[in-house]
Amino acid sequence: MRKLRYLYHGSSKRVNILMPQLADDWRFEAGRHFGVYATSNRDLALAFALGGVPDETGTCHRIIREKDRKPFKMTFVRGHPKFGSKGYLYKLSSRGFHHVGGDQWVCENPVKPIKIAEINVDDYIHLFRYATLKERCEIERAFRKQIKRSKENKINKW
């Protein structure tokens, strides 16, 4: 994959330096690295800038599947965006990032943004949708299977 000049990161929090963190994407290995995640897809970063508010069970679960990419939508399985609040779109130099799959890039070091744009969440609600009841059941079933498999793998390693 060709190296891009700029990448994007979206968050509901404003910071001057993006610090590496351990990501936990139960579906893909590319989403389990320690680092600062960025994307070549501006809409994807904006969707993460919408933030997430837990539902009545205390859960906020959002997902982006291949079928939700044209047109782009982040699917809220549980919870909802932070309506009425601010989000932040970070424009980053691609220096130090390596491609980990799809639209995702990771840098293991702290990253100073080139530019930070404050957004109104309500201006970007077209980038999300709620999961249907059927989708929610399918996604949560797959999640439970993955958790069970993960626990079994940890037990089998001992």
Predicted features along the sequence, with ranges:
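Glycine-rich nucleotide phosphate-binding loop and flanking beta-alpha elements
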Residues: 14-15, 46, 96-98
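Compact, glycine/acidic-enriched structural inserts
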Residues: 42, 46-49
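ADP-ribose/NAD+-binding catalytic cleft of ART/PARP-like enzymes
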Residues: 1-32, 50-51
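Conserved NAD+-utilizing ADP-ribose enzyme module
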Residues: 1, 32, 51-158
